[in-house]
Regions:
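Hydrophobic faces of well-ordered beta-strands that scaffold small-molecule active sites
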Residues: 55-59, 117-119, 146-150, 197-201, ...
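His/Asp/Glu-enriched, well-ordered alpha-helical/loop segment
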Residues: 247-263, 305-380, 386, 390-394
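Alpha-helical scaffold segments that flank or form the walls of functional sites
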Residues: 69-145, 177-191, 412-420
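Metal-coordinating catalytic core of metallo-dependent amide/deamination hydrolases
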Residues: 130-267
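Active-site gating loops and adjacent loop-to-helix segments of metal-dependent hydrolytic enzymes
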Residues: 67-98, 127, 155-175, 234-264, ...
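Active-site microenvironment of metallo-dependent hydrolases
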Residues: 1-21, 28-30, 36-38, 353-420
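Glycine-enriched alpha-helix->loop->beta-strand junction motifs that scaffold or abut catalytic
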Residues: 220-225, 257-258, 263-265, 282-291, ...
């Protein structure tokens, strides 16, 4: 790992165009402001042919799904995609496969300028934290900043086809077992400033109402964001209407009004496609945040998120890529470009950068107190990348791993039978 820089000097992205300045970085890898004099350590310096931007935040990702990238047909809808990927192969996921898949995903993110990622991980496979630890190991091996949502999955569809049911059974954990594993993992990473573990929930179709209540409460108690898939497809709406007599956001709103959860302002929900305007009003009232995954939603035919409706209500909006195997790539810059083209009714500035609440150190902006996470572009291409002031990509190459030798070769070997 490279030494942490004490300052970064060059032309930074500004509202009116590039601005020349030098930002100071403290020993913990946070921006302290513009440098007042010569730095006491190494300075990263770039000329006028480079542009320095904050590192992108991928606010919703399933990195282990990168193992399926060569197996998919881009024409598959969501149900077909699930049948031929996670419900066919996730029960076969070993620690090594999770590690290699995540190294592939995190490495490709860093090469695309993504410096922090929020992961939703539910592939526990009856192994406690064994597979979860491999995601964390991959983040450390590549150098990315990881917000790890240890996802609870406590619902098995009894009428599911055999492979789907077997997969769901492998993800399943009782609330008590889940909470023990979560607490264990939080303790294990508590001294790592680049890894945060938080409770996460899958969805209304993969969680009981008890599980949802406990997860929301746990996140509030810990003061951590809780990730949750919200109305990604019509099925969750139909399920909530059948079981609870209300639409998904109405169910969440009712939990607050009955005092079962203290609030929803720490929920980081993804997709939000099949959400009515009245539900958006309640989301704004309860201060939920939304992660949109527009390219993935288009590709699998899930639907189109009403970005303007959310932004009009001042609901904080982040961008994510979901999994690589259900998207074109893992670039948030490409996600942003697609959103600006696909949503001409939305002001481009609304799809820009915003602060992401990474525990202990916010990220996403080049401002004092934020993590010193930067991407340096030369002719529009990512040249160098810094995470917490340490360079992890140089001249378009990941510094910590040889991706072709250390990841791609063994991954192809381990999954060869999947392609036959």
């Amino acid at each position: 790992m490279t030494e942490r820089i004490a300052a970064l000097r060059g032309w930074f992205e500004g509202a009116e165009g590039p601005v020349f300045k030098e930002l100071a970085v403290d020993p913990e890898g946070r921006v302290t402001g513009e440098a007042k004099g010569p730095s006491c350590g190494e300075t990263g310096e770039y000329g006028p042919d480079c542009l320095i931007l904050p590192g992108d935040v991928n606010a919703h990702s399933h990195p282990e799904q990168s193992v399926y990238a060569e197996l998919v047909d881009p024409s598959w809808d969501l149900a077909t995609w699930c049948r031929h990927t996670i419900y066919r192969h996730s029960v076969e996921m070993t620690p090594e496969l999770v590690y290699l898949g995540c190294c592939r995903a995190f490495g490709r993110m860093l090469l695309a300028g993504v410096t922090a990622v929020a992961v939703s991980f539910y592939c526990h496979n009856r192994r406690g934290n064994d597979l979860d630890r491999e995601v964390i190991r991959a983040a450390r091996a590549t150098g990315i900043r990881l917000f790890f949502g240890r996802m609870h999955y406590d619902w098995v569809a009894q009428d599911a086809y055999p492979a789907k049911k077997a997969s769901q059974e492998s993800y399943f954990e009782t609330p008590e077992a889940y909470e023990r594993a979560l607490e264990e993992l939080i303790r294990e990473v508590q001294d790592d400033p680049l890894v945060a573990v938080a409770p996460a929930l899958h969805s209304f179709h993969a969680n009981t109402l008890e599980g949802i209540v406990r997860g929301i409460r746990r996140g509030a108690l810990l003061g951590l964001p809780v990730q949750f898939h919200l109305s990604e497809d019509r099925g969750d709406v139909d399920l909530c209407l059948r079981l609870y007599g209300r639409r998904p956001v109405e169910v969440l709103d009712d939990l607050v009004r009955r005092g079962e959860v203290p609030g929803l302002d720490h929920l980081l929900v993804s997709d939000g496609i099949w959400v009515e305007d009245s539900e958006k009003d309640r989301m704004a009232e309860h201060q939920l945040s939304l992660v949109a995954n527009p390219r993935m939603n288009r590709r699998v035919g899930a639907g189109r998120t009403d970005l303007k409706g959310y932004l009009d209500r001042k609901i904080p909006l982040f961008l994510g890529t979901d999994g690589e195997a259900s998207n074109d790539d893992l670039s948030v810059a490409h996600e942003r470009r697609f959103a600006r083209e696909a949503y001409p009714e939305v002001p481009a500035a609304s799809l820009g950068r915003r602060a992401f609440p990474f525990p202990g150190t916010p990220v996403g902006l080049a401002e004092p107190g934020f993590g010193a996470d930067f991407q340096v572009l030369r002719d529009g291409t990512v040249e160098d990348v810094y995470v917490a002031g340490r360079r992890v990509v140089h001249r378009g190459r990941l510094l910590s791993l040889d991706l072709r030798r250390d990841v791609e070769a063994p991954l192809r070997e381990r999954t060869a039978s999947w392609r036959n």
